[in-house]
């Protein structure tokens, strides 16, 4: 890796400012899934073993820089964090100002402090509107560590401006290092072949950049979900009432043309599970060549498509998956996505990478999160990294000394 990592630092008895991603899903004040907190623990524990004073900063939700709002407080995160660490973690009532400065000053080596939600201040998402915000955060630490991959595609103060105040002292955390290793080396730089990408979700337009980038890398591109229907419509198929992004039909045709010129095999659904609506108790398995009747719409890939996708996965040496292939939240339209999750989890030898977001939720639902090689903690960030080859938040980290 060409960036400084946390293991290159000498943080003993020093204050280390760590940007983590504790933007966890919440409902009624309770955390629904703490994977993002767990994912940050290796870096936190590493720094504590080095007897560093660890200052954690994160955002939660979208309070839009309008000051403290209890529903966006990081207090629920503290309770989970204390459970993992086994000791008290103070929450500074703010991330800047006198109360924050005092909390930082009182922090002893071997202890952890969590600053309150960064996005309570306009200067986090809009650094140009309040340059003093990043400047004050920068004053807290001797070193800076970015372990928030899922936020590093944004040019926000804590991931883009603050690290620039730490020349030679801004490092990637262990989670960030793992993300860059899997997405960079295993997918972009030297993927084992055959390399297969599976893309689902609703829209082509939101993923056209990553599709075009993957056409330079992959041997097989499997397309399903709403995106798959748009490609099928571009080929003149009758899709009934299925979700089609009509404004993206020319994009789809162009992708098919590029794929052909680059010897990339694009595989589209050959059959689907179709129903009148998601509340229907009954569905029909319909061949795409036969055409979906006007009153029905496709909500999942059919058994023949599932079998074909799994066959290609099984013969691949590298697989990347982003976006479900059906409406996985509503059984029985979850079976295609669950089958893909199981195929990835049970593959005996392939490097299998899941690109965050809904695909990560499906893999968790299938009980395969620990069976795949890597589940990215950033949906949008993982796609942008694959498209650009870098992220704003990683570009500003210090270069490796080796």
From Swiss-Prot:
Binding of ATP, residues: 207, 298, 329, 356-359
EC number(s) reported in the record: 2.7.2.3
Pathway as given in its UniProt record: Carbohydrate degradation; glycolysis; pyruvate from D-glyceraldehyde 3-phosphate: step 2/5
Keyword Phosphoprotein: no
Catalytic function, reaction form: (2R)-3-phosphoglycerate + ATP = (2R)-3-phospho-glyceroyl phosphate + ADP
GO molecular function terms noted in the UniProt entry: ADP binding; ATP binding; phosphoglycerate kinase activity
Main location: cytoplasm
Enzyme type, top EC level: transferase
UniProt keyword Kinase, yes or no: yes
Residues binding substrate: 21-23, 36, 59-62, 119, 154
BP-aspect Gene Ontology terms: gluconeogenesis; glycolytic process
Matches recorded under CDD domains: Phosphoglycerate_kinase
Family annotation (Pfam families): PGK
GO cellular component: cytosol
Xref: InterPro entries: Phosphoglycerate_kinase, Phosphoglycerate_kinase_CS, Phosphoglycerate_kinase_N, Phosphoglycerate_kinase_sf
Keywords: ATP-binding, Cytoplasm, Glycolysis, Kinase, Nucleotide-binding, Transferase
Domain of life: Bacteria
Subunit structure and binding partners: Monomer.
Family affiliation: Belongs to the phosphoglycerate kinase family.
PANTHER family with a match to the protein in the record: PHOSPHOGLYCERATE KINASE (PTHR11406), PHOSPHOGLYCERATE KINASE 1, CHLOROPLASTIC-RELATED (PTHR11406:SF23)
Protein name: Phosphoglycerate kinase
Originating species: Chlamydia pneumoniae (Chlamydophila pneumoniae)
